[in-house]
Swiss-Prot record:
It comes from the Bacteria. Belongs to the RuvA family. GO terms for cellular component: cytoplasm; Holliday junction helicase complex; Holliday junction resolvase complex. InterPro entries: DNA_helicase_Holl-junc_RuvA_I (IPR013849), Hlx-hairpin-Hlx_DNA-bd_motif (IPR003583), NA-bd_OB-fold (IPR012340), RuvA (IPR000085), RuvA_2-like (IPR010994), RuvA_C (IPR011114), RuvA_C_sf (IPR036267). The RuvA-RuvB-RuvC complex processes Holliday junction (HJ) DNA during genetic recombination and DNA repair, while the RuvA-RuvB complex plays an important role in the rescue of blocked DNA replication forks via replication fork reversal (RFR). RuvA specifically binds to HJ cruciform DNA, conferring on it an open structure. The RuvB hexamer acts as an ATP-dependent pump, pulling dsDNA into and through the RuvAB complex. HJ branch migration allows RuvC to scan DNA until it finds its consensus sequence, where it cleaves and resolves the cruciform DNA. It comes from Xanthomonas campestris pv. campestris (strain ATCC 33913 / DSM 3586 / NCPPB 528 / LMG 568 / P 25). The keyword Heme does not apply. Residues 140-144 are annotated as: Flexible linker. Coiled coil: none annotated. The keyword Cytoplasm applies. This is Holliday junction branch migration complex subunit RuvA. Homotetramer. Forms an RuvA(8)-RuvB(12)-Holliday junction (HJ) complex. HJ DNA is sandwiched between 2 RuvA tetramers; dsDNA enters through RuvA and exits via RuvB. An RuvB hexamer assembles on each DNA strand where it exits the tetramer. Each RuvB hexamer is contacted by two RuvA subunits (via domain III) on 2 adjacent RuvB subunits; this complex drives branch migration. In the full resolvosome a probable DNA-RuvA(4)-RuvB(12)-RuvC(2) complex forms which resolves the HJ. Residues 1-64 are annotated as: Domain I. GO terms for molecular function: ATP binding; four-way junction DNA binding; four-way junction helicase activity.
Length: 194
């Protein structure tokens, strides 16, 4: 319906903002990740949008980055999750952090996001694990070995085409204390060729 808006930012007060496009003010709801990077009121802005129509309401959601909109849509495909929790996810963690949490199955960290309990977090991991690599923005892979380094290596291996479980196993087995993420990935790929 409405995939993108380009106009002047007329109003911003979390979670709402208004964009003036040719004299028409579009009211959108947006996650905090979008609010952090919005320009000042009166400046030009381009937002990716998601249009949602229910029996009794019509809503428009705005995102500065396409990856955020994609994550917003995919999270809502999980049984029992709607726009409110999807916005909470994007307000609580970055897209890359969410991909790592899903890939590593970190239920505890997911339950720290408002509105997500243990059962919902478990359901998210099960239903989104195969798509987690699609969430990642492809940020540079750096850092020391640890839970985040293993998760980053796992995501990178998934982006290379490995199944989530196989990528996680490869990253765990290849990592040694003190290795950088790039080294873990290289060792995992070398081991896969043997």
């Amino acid at each position: 319906m409405i995939g993108r808006l380009r106009g002047i930012l007329a109003y911003k007060q979390p979670p709402w903002l208004v964009i003036d496009v040719g004299g028409v003010g579009y009211e959108l709801e947006a996650p905090m990740s979008t609010f952090y990077d919005l320009p000042d009121v009166g400046r030009d802005v381009i937002l990716f949008t998601h249009y949602a129509q229910k029996e009794d309401s019509v809503s428009l959601y705005g995102f500065l980055r396409e990856g955020e909109r994609r994550l917003f849509r995919d999270v809502q495909k999980v049984t029992g999750i709607g726009a409110k929790i999807a916005l909470a996810v994007l307000s609580g963690v970055t897209v890359d952090e969410f991909a790592r949490l899903i890939t590593s199955g970190d239920i505890t960290a997911l339950t720290r996001i408002p509105g997500i309990g243990k059962k919902t977090a478990e359901r998210m991991v099960v239903e989104l694990r195969d798509r987690a690599a699609d969430f990642s923005s492809g940020a540079p892979i750096t850092g020391q070995l640890g839970p985040d380094a293993v998760s980053e290596a796992t995501v990178a291996l998934q982006q290379l085409g490995y199944k989530p479980a196989e990528a996680a196993r490869m990253a765990r087995e290849a990592g040694a204390e003190g290795d950088e993420v790039a080294t873990v990935i290289r060792k995992a790929l070398q081991a896969a060729l043997r």
